[in-house]
Amino acid sequence: MALREIGDGWIHIKDNAPIRRVVFAKAMWAAGGGAQVFLLILIGMEAGFGSVAAGSIGILYMARGFGSGTGPVIGRRLMRSDRLKPSLLGWSIFFAGVFYLAISAVDWSWVILLLVFISHGSSGINWVMSTTLLQERTDDEWRGRVAGTDYLLLTSMMGFSALGAGLILEGGHLTLRETIALTAIIQIGMGAIWLIFATPKERLMIN
């Protein structure tokens, strides 16, 4: 019975394009962002923000947390704009990647705290806006199953992303900086995919 209801939820998502588009938004961020969760730890171990690595890691995660919380507050007007709303999910993924690409290129000094803050502020907009849109577009009967699918896709993609980056580093295929750049490029690509394919359809819904 439970499995059938889950299956019915997936069919409902498949048959409803406005829901289907948005349910992948967090997973698109996580294609690169999943790896960045643990790459941030490795950055903290190399960056010199304190006498011990744990302090540097904590400071980086504090910047990440403040960014995730502040981004949606600052971006609230953007999320309400009919002109910007159709493309905002794509841009939020895109710019999250851009700032991690910058992190891969600059010296790991205090400046990366600002870059981490801005990147995760952008991804925070993605998380809040995608959740809000799913709530708005889904009837009560399906809301739990849609939300469950949303987080299933997110956590699965985070796992695949982290595993892939871990294997790349362990195998010595890329350096830490190069791996960070790769995850950033993946996010930029995912954001571009949303902007090219999803934004026009989102605009049609508003118009």
Question: At which residue positions do the language-model features occur?
Answer:
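Contiguous, function-dense segments enriched for cysteine-driven chemistry
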Residues: L42
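Juxtamembrane intracellular "pre-TM" segments in multi-pass secondary transporters
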Residues: M1-F24
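C-terminal transmembrane bundle of multi-pass solute transporters/carriers
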Residues: G7, M45-N207
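Phosphate- and divalent-cation-binding pockets in alpha/beta enzyme and binding domains
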Residues: V23, L39, L113
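Residues at helix-coil transition
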Residues: I11-D15, G33, M45-E46
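Conserved extracellular-gate-facing transmembrane-helix segments in secondary transporters
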Residues: W29-V37, M158
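Alpha-helical segments in transporter systems
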Residues: R21-A31, D150-L154
